[in-house]
């Protein structure tokens, strides 16, 4: 068998490495190495959201992993939801270490606008009531106000997990932690350049039944920045790795085969 690839799975806001528990063994059974990491203040990471100021602070575990790779080692990055923003930072700093960056129903930044652009567009195009019982709370200081975000049970059930099993929803409900979109940081920054971020091959996986980041917005992002390839998982809600793990695995195996 051909040498297996190394997949690095990057979870979305309020989630952790645990969200990949169905996908990880499938990729490993196909001969690949899989790292499903916890970002800062996520999963079992001991930091609290109140300790984080910037997207970079939040992304640190991914940056440390990329830094630790040997000079000739390359990975396939998979970012889910807000995890697409973390991918952006890794692509900018380590483009030579990435075979491809896979955006799974994710926010996908561009190198033209401010780093907050796609999140601002999402907020403009998505009615505020779509957030349901998600809590947005201030933290930080008066000089540096920040906002945390915590998904409520209704938002999880109706916008993210509506096609998942009751067990997966129960698991998520017990494990989600407060997170942030880091809008205050991103709106002041231009983290992504065409020369570095833009040089990495991008694959977008569209989830057709997603009510969190709707298909229409996923496709708008693809049109906004362009991708090497777009793949569709029909019948997947926002949590494709839980409701359609076999289909997602098949798509990722195809990507592993194709991007060398």
Swiss-Prot record:
Pfam families: Abhydrolase_6
Binding positions for salicylate per the UniProt entry: 13, 81, 159, 238, 253, 257
Effect of residue 81 to A: Abolishes methyl salicylate esterase activity
PROSITE patterns (UniProt xref): LIPASE_SER
SUPFAM superfamilies in the record: alpha/beta-Hydrolases
Domain of life the protein comes from: Eukaryota
Effect of residue 13 to L: Abolishes salicylic acid-binding
Keywords for this protein: Hydrolase, Immunity, Innate immunity, Plant defense
Any one biological process term the GO annotation gives: jasmonic acid metabolic process
Pathway: Plant hormone biosynthesis
EC number: 3.1.1.-
An MF annotation (GO) of this entry: methyl salicylate esterase activity
Top-level enzyme category: hydrolase
Active-site residue numbers: 81, 210, 238
Record bears the keyword Chloroplast: no
InterPro entries given in the database record: AB_hydrolase_1 (IPR000073), AB_hydrolase_fold (IPR029058), MES/HNL (IPR045889)
The UniProt record lists the keyword Hydrolase: yes
Catalysed reactions, as listed in the record: methyl salicylate + H2O = salicylate + methanol + H(+)
Mechanisms controlling activity: Esterase activity is down-regulated by salicylic acid (SA) or by tetraFA, a synthetic SA analog.
Other known facts: Two amino acid substitutions near the catalytic pocket are sufficient to switch from an esterase to a hydroxynitrile lyase activity.
Family to which the UniProt record says this protein belongs: Belongs to the AB hydrolase superfamily. Methylesterase family.
Function: Required to convert methyl salicylate (MeSA) to salicylic acid (SA) as part of the signal transduction pathways that activate systemic acquired resistance in systemic tissue. MeSA is believed to be an inactive form that needs to be demethylated to exert a biological effect. Also able to catalyze the conversion of acibenzolar-S-methyl into acibenzolar to induce systemic acquired resistance.
Name this protein carries in UniProt: Salicylic acid-binding protein 2
